[in-house]
């Protein structure tokens, strides 16, 4: 069910909810009926002030509820600050999602890798791309998207990866 609330309006509302003392009640409500409610919960998880351990707990509870690319991708974008505060901890945290058989769990893991397209992680990202195998459309498109971002930031390394591979994702 979709209400039709635009993303910029949801972001404004998410910032307001994240500032409230009772934001946890909103995030922990799992009986959402509308796309926008789920999207809003993901945004609040990314925006609310909390320790990294608590945020990862909320992420773990939220990820299984992701059922479309938009919620996944916006949620991952909202986690940018969390990644900056605990880059290696979050790196370890997302590893199990990268081998999940579930389409949107693996997409979550791959889209989270976008935060790691840097000198320190580029080789690991391309190695992961090399072993990636999943039949689901949205997982495959996330991997193709990640490789395109790698190519923009590290064209030589990414081209070396792409040349010997018949990449069809």
Question: In which residue ranges do the predicted regions lie?
Answer:
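Amphipathic alpha-helical scaffolding segments comprising HEAT/armadillo-like alpha-solenoid repeats
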Residues: 18-28, 50-61, 85-96, 119-130, ...
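Residue-level detector of extended alpha-helical repeat arrays and alpha-solenoid scaffolds
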Residues: 38, 72-73, 106, 140
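Conserved small/polar residues in nucleotide/adenosyl-binding loops
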Residues: 168-169
């Amino acid at each position: 069910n979709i209400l039709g609330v635009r993303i910029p309006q949801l972001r404004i509302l998410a910032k307001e909810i994240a500032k409230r003392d009772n934001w946890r009640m909103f995030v922990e409500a799992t009986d959402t009926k509308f796309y926008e409610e789920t999207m809003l919960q993901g945004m609040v998880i990314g925006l609310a002030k909390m320790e990294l351990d608590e945020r990862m707990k909320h992420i773990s509870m939220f990820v299984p509820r992701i059922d479309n690319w938009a919620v996944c991708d916006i949620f991952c974008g909202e986690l940018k600050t969390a990644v900056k505060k605990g880059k290696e901890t979050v790196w370890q945290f997302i590893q199990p999602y990268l081998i999940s058989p579930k389409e949107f769990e693996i997409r979550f893991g791959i889209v989270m890798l976008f935060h790691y397209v840097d000198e320190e992680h580029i080789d690991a990202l391309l190695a992961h791309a090399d072993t990636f195998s999943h039949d689901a459309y949205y997982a495959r498109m996330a991997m193709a998207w990640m490789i395109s971002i790698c190519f923009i930031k590290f064209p030589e390394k990414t081209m070396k990866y792409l040349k010997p591979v018949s990449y069809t994702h």
